[in-house]
């Protein structure tokens, strides 16, 4: 069993939430949202029933807090620690042990905060304070009136949040909030994998997977460096496990890997959906540092735009 120098501790601990300023706390589920937690705790009705939408909308005039306690260890010499939020919706402040470590303003990205020297041995308290999205867009609209969809709420164009939440000609006004993706504590002594991009080239009887792997140095997770493009001791290997259990491995920082006689993925109703498991393992001077695993389907997509009596078969 490989031991990686990058440790990823999921904060799937017991969370609680409440309306900011309210003494009553409720059990929360993370990942989740304010609406799903209020529904689960009997604090709101189904927003899609009758005119409950309007009462659900009023709830988002308020601020909400989420809190959890987790067991941590202090960073050792040479280690860096980061809190990673894979999805926060949307305007919020982050506190670790009552110290503000950052704020967010965009639900369409991942957020990471350096907490080296801030994580204690033993119990740590993590708190996320969500500001009302309705108050945010109201203030932004008053400063700069800008319109979007006629059926959406004024000011929605000023916030980096799923715009469908603010209403559409077909949609309800339900601007939810919350920690909608996982939270992790990262501890590392070296860099870690930042991204893996896989391209597929299909030929008769085979598929070639082409890899682009980038890493983050431990000092700055915002910086991306292609693995294998610098003489810094970083390499990676790729392992692909076929649906039948066959394993293909390519070492020494491969740019591509060939799968012979592939099992192709087809849309529902057209064929089967076999998945291949791809694992990229990064090492520094031969020591495993980090790994990345995903399941992918081998497929291509083209648009049928042959001429027809109206122009082309695909409307675009």
Regions found by a protein language model. Give the residues of each.
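Secreted/periplasmic carbohydrate-active enzymes, especially glycoside hydrolases
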Residues: 1-316
């Amino acid at each position: 069993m490989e031991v990686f120098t990058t440790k990823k501790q999921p904060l799937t601990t017991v969370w609680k939430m409440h309306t900011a300023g309210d003494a009553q706390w409720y059990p929360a589920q993370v990942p989740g949202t304010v609406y799903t937690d209020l529904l689960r705790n009997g604090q709101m009705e189904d927003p899609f029933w009758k005119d409950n939408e309007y009462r659900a909308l009023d709830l988002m005039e308020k601020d909400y807090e989420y809190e959890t306690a987790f067991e941590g260890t202090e960073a050792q010499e040479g280690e860096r620690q980061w809190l990673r939020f894979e999805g926060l919706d949307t305007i919020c402040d982050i506190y670790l042990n009552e110290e503000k470590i950052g704020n967010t303003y965009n639900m369409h990205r991942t957020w990471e905060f350096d907490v080296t020297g801030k994580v204690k041995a033993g119990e740590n308290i993590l708190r996320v304070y969500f500001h009302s999205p309705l108050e945010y867009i109201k203030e932004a609209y008053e400063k700069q009136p800008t319109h979007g969809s006629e059926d959406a709420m004024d000011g929605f164009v000023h916030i980096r949040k799923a715009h469908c939440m603010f209403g559409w000609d077909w949609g309800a006004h339900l601007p939810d909030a919350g920690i909608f993706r996982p939270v992790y504590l990262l501890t590392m002594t070296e860099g870690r994998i930042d991204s893996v991009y896989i391209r597929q080239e299909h030929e008769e009887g085979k598929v070639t997977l082409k890899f682009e792997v980038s890493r983050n140095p431990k000092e700055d997770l915002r910086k991306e460096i292609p693995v294998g493009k610098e003489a810094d001791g970083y390499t990676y290997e790729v392992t692909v496990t076929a649906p039948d259990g066959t394993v293909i491995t390519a070492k020494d920082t491969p740019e591509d890997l060939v799968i012979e006689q592939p099992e192709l993925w087809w849309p529902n109703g057209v064929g089967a959906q076999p998945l291949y498991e791809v694992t990229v393992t990064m090492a520094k001077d031969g020591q495993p540092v980090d790994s990345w695993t995903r399941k992918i389907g081998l497929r291509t997509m083209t648009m049928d735009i042959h001429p027809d009596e109206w122009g082309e078969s695909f409307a675009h």
